[in-house]
Regions:
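Alpha/beta enzyme core
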Residues: 1-95, 101, 105-150
Length: 150
């Protein structure tokens, strides 16, 4: 699978999320890259962070499926990273991200409550532990006293 436009390798070099293919020359370059990747045998192509008309033109001109991530509706399929869908990041999202839930706050609250319960001795409680038959427990304690167990 090929990947053009914004790629993980270019993020730091570009200084973060930057749209690719905004000029005619850059858009033509992306099309050339797409055709070259198809030619070398890519079975599909991710088009990331590019203007929708550029992604649509690429999709119309290559014979392999395109998956868009911030590339508009003209691709054959869409990608949205699950961390973004669920709102797990505490940061400003790229323009193409639509957050469907804010689980970050829920998750942080859950871990804080867990920590508080452990520190206060409320977890684990009896209902969270496995019991032992009284006779077996007494036999085990006797074995410990006799030095039979370790």
């Amino acid at each position: 699978m090929g990947h053009i436009g914004l790629t993980p390798q270019t993020l730091s070099r570009l200084g973060g999320y930057r749209v690719q293919g905004k000029t005619a020359a850059a858009a033509t370059g992306l099309l050339a890259d797409a055709l070259a990747l198809e030619e070398v045998g890519c079975y599909a192509l991710v088009l990331e962070a590019m203007p929708a008309p550029v992604a649509t033109a690429i999709t119309e001109r290559i014979g392999i499926p395109t998956l868009g991530i911030g590339a508009g509706p003209g691709c054959d399929g869409q990608v949205l990273v699950f961390h973004d869908v669920l709102g797990l990041y505490d940061r400003v999202n790229p323009r193409f991200v639509k957050e469907y839930a804010n689980l970050r706050a829920i998750i942080l609250n859950a871990f804080a409550a867990y920590r508080d319960d452990v520190v206060a001795g409320r977890f684990p409680a009896d209902e969270h532990t496995y019991p032992m038959d009284e006779a077996a427990a007494a036999e085990f304690q006797a074995a410990l006293r006799d030095g039979a167990a370790g």
